Amino acid sequence: MQKELDEIFYDALTNDSNVTAIVPATRIFSTCIEVPPMENDNTPLPYIIITDDPFQDEQATKDELWESDWDTVQAGIEIAAASPNAVKQLRRTIRHALAQYVESMSDNERPVLRSFSNEGIAWDWTKPCYYDTLHYQCDMYFPIDDDNEQNEG
């Protein structure tokens, strides 16, 4: 079964030695792994949270009878660190790790980047910490036949 975008990002970041040298894998969280909300409040800096954002099926109109095999999917990566420079370093390291990981994937499983943006470094006085959120929008191929076979099995 093909992985979702947030799962790909989680695997990429937890398996990259440059990322885990800065942020231990135990402080890289994802929506595909249950994390009690209160645990995030006490997590030492730096940490990363990968989010599974809403997506849109790539069909011509909403009146079509069948879904397309291609979906436009989105995921976010929140970076929290003690200084703006630490956020910038992590942002560069994360982007490089994701690019390398995606390039190593097979063509059928590889997400195709559609757009990338970030919110900019901001201060959270409640933590306190600096943070930035990266937003990725990608096209991914999810064969509908595979979904039907999985539901039948």
Regions found by a protein language model. Give the residues of each.
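Small/polar-rich, solvent-exposed N-terminal microdomains that initiate assembly or binding
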Residues: 1-64, 85, 148-153
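Residue-level marker of positions within ordered structural domains that often coincide
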Residues: 18, 55, 82, 99, ...
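Short, charged, surface-exposed interaction patches
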Residues: 40-71, 110-130
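Oligomerization/assembly interface segments of phage tail-like spikes and tubes
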Residues: 67-85, 129-141
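Extracellular/virion structural assembly segments
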Residues: 82-99
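Acidic-leaning, charged glycine-interspersed low-complexity segments
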Residues: 96-153
